[in-house]
Amino acid sequence: MSVIDTNQIDLAAPRISEAGVADYVALLKPRVMSLVVFTALVGMLLAPGDFHPVLAVTAMLCIAVGGGAAGALNMWYENDIDALMTRTANRPIPRGRVTRPEALTFGMTLSFFSVVTLGVLVNWIAAALLAFTIFFYVVIYTMWLKRSTAQNIVIGGAAGALPPVVAWAAVTGSLAVEPLLLFAIIFFWTPPHFWALALFRNDDYARAGVPMLPVVAGPDHTRLQILLYTIVLVAVAAAPWPLGYFDAVYGIASLALGGWMLVLAIRVYRHRSGSAALRATRNLFKFSILYLFALFSILLIEVVAKAVWQLFA
């Protein structure tokens, strides 16, 4: 009589994940999604013309879901890197809460429906821009740039800068200078923000084999690049004021916020070792988040204030 080896049966059986709603939400990278939604909202409210509230909500949901889908596909592809890094080891796939096929299906499904819904219900120019954003982040940045060049963040930052452009196009069906200015601000903000993170997570990236700038070129060169990009960022962020696109309130606030960020970048450049260096990089990283939210909040407040003024004028 033959004996059935139950161990072999168990090993051959497909693994069923224990994923819950929270795990799928985590795949969407909620913190990154919040930045996507916020910058897109500013781009939408700055756009001229009337936009039906239902279409506005639809467009924002599509942009949010598309951004989350890109995050899920990023986690699907980078599960090997995530498992090696302390910062990302608790993500759903490395923990075994979600399988790679499940994450891929989830990301692809959300990508498809977000783009198609935006195209059918709003307009196809915005949908094409959203599709390009997802493609750029997943294929160009995640699959190619991140593992091949120290300039991964610089070039790949274009994906994170596109949401306000998508939102503007959702309203107008076209492009203009204003959304491109918002794009430029986020684009030049990205390197100082992520390189500050990379400086105090250098060992993590080195262990995972990710060629971030501190790993490839060293911390000192990274500090110099942070300073240079911060100088460019301050200039780019202030430029819409003298160019006549945003008013003096924004201009003065951008100079004040940019001035403090520049001070923090100088401290990162000057302090190169010990606890002072770690504190400087952490402070810059934390403030850079506040900087972008504050800058875009000022634009948001101005738009709302003008709308209220016109309503009661």
From Swiss-Prot:
Q: Keyword annotations for this protein? A: Cell inner membrane, Cell membrane, Heme biosynthesis, Membrane, Transferase, Transmembrane, Transmembrane helix
Q: Name one Pfam family in it.
A: UbiA
Q: How does it sit in the membrane?
A: Multi-pass membrane protein
Example GO BP: heme O biosynthetic process
What are the TM regions of this chain, as residue ranges?
32-52, 53-73, 120-140, 153-173, 180-200, 226-246, 248-268, 284-304
Location in the cell reads: Cell inner membrane
Catalysis: reaction(s):
heme b + (2E,6E)-farnesyl diphosphate + H2O = Fe(II)-heme o + diphosphate
EC numbers: 2.5.1.141
| GO cellular component term, pick one | plasma membrane
Q: Name one GO molecular function term.
A: protoheme IX farnesyltransferase activity
Which InterPro entries does the annotation name? Protohaem_IX_farnesylTrfase, UbiA_prenyltransferase, UbiA_prenylTrfase_CS, UbiA_sf
- The cysteines covalently paired via disulfide bonds are none
- According to its UniProt record, in which pathway does this protein act? Porphyrin-containing compound metabolism; heme O biosynthesis; heme O from protoheme: step 1/1
Cross-referenced NCBIfam families: cyoE_ctaB (TIGR01473), PRK04375.1-2 (NF003349)
Alphabetized PANTHER family for the sequence = 4-HYDROXYBENZOATE SOLANESYLTRANSFERASE, PROTOHEME IX FARNESYLTRANSFERASE, MITOCHONDRIAL
Miscellaneous comment as given in the Swiss-Prot or TrEMBL entry: Carbon 2 of the heme B porphyrin ring is defined according to the Fischer nomenclature.
Sequence similarity: Belongs to the UbiA prenyltransferase family. Protoheme IX farnesyltransferase subfamily.
What is the role of the protein in this entry?
Answer: Converts heme B (protoheme IX) to heme O by substitution of the vinyl group on carbon 2 of heme B porphyrin ring with a hydroxyethyl farnesyl side group.
From the Swiss-Prot or TrEMBL record, give the protein name.
Protoheme IX farnesyltransferase
Species, as recorded: Rhodopseudomonas palustris (strain BisB5)
